[in-house]
Swiss-Prot record:
Function: Catalyzes the irreversible NADPH-dependent deamination of GMP to IMP. It functions in the conversion of nucleobase, nucleoside and nucleotide derivatives of G to A nucleotides, and in maintaining the intracellular balance of A and G nucleotides.
Complexes and interactors: Homotetramer.
InterPro entries linked: Aldolase_TIM, GMP_reductase, GMPR, IMP_DH/GMP_Rdtase_CS, IMP_DH_GMPRt
EC class name: oxidoreductase
PANTHER family membership: GMP REDUCTASE
Name listed for the protein in its UniProt record: GMP reductase
Amino acid sequence: MRIEQELKLGFKDVLFRPKRSTLKSRSQVELTRDFTFKHSGRQWSGTPVIAANMDSVGSFAMAKALSEHGVMTAVHKHYTVADWAEFIKENDASVLKNAMVSTGTSEADFQKTKDIMALTDDLIFICIDIANGYSEHLVQYVEKVRAEFPDKVISAGNVVTGDMVEELILAGADIVKVGIGPGSVCTTRVKTGVGYPQLSAIIECADAAHGLGGRIIGDGGCSCAGDVSKAFGGGADFVMLGGMLAGHEESGGEVIEQDGKTFMKFYGMSSQSAMDKHSGGVAKYRAAEGKTVLLPFRGSVHNTISDILGGVRSTCTYVGAAKLKELTKRTTFIRVQEQENNVFGKE
């Protein structure tokens, strides 16, 4: 047993220190980023925010809506090949280039991914997603997928430390997904005692990935636009959002009427609800590691994503970053014990 004494930080532990800026307006800030990925050599240009691959967030409708903003969606893995064929038939490359095909690591998952990717050349992203990215099986699976798809962009995770980021990149991942337990409907840290504060995880994993020419996704922990900015400031190349994009008409969640009000069900992908729906219940050897909540129906996602991106633009003006790419270089975090004045409630 050993104890690491260094304090690790989450988004609530810091604020940006403002800096002199020549920017006169948020409209001058460029949020689009251009990436060329290490292994595939593929290029992608867009706003590096991703809707999470949860079946009450990462729907086909969400992918279509967010593509209008240049934002990506990691489409959840529970759509069939026939569902994908219909989606591809109805949408052009401008939508498909911003849709990630999510997969697990079983042999059936591998075959399904091959079947989906064979439908069109316009799909370029594969998201290999398991809760515990420290499994040697994941590394082997990444190698297998890379051998099968040498020209596709592969994301793999989830992990929270630099050593595993490096191993996954060397195995063939272009992007590593970072985050264990920070999500709003995730209870992994409570059920297992395992995790890592998300901002420190991003800072450390970004350093490891960038040293090898790889990229990272900060996955989870954002509850407001300021947190999204902090993730980018900490070095995340992409930021993945679940709860912030849940509860919308495009989210794909179950709509429930209660006392004349409309709600949408939102749950973690290791929750009782998810396992009842997709696995026939919680296996005897497992514990559910997610919550199920009812969110007030929030209407169209277009307003929400515009508000989030507006907040990130505003962050950039406060620290003098004319481009999102510059934000991490312009970032100085100060440690704090308070974030906001809640006398009239939380924002």
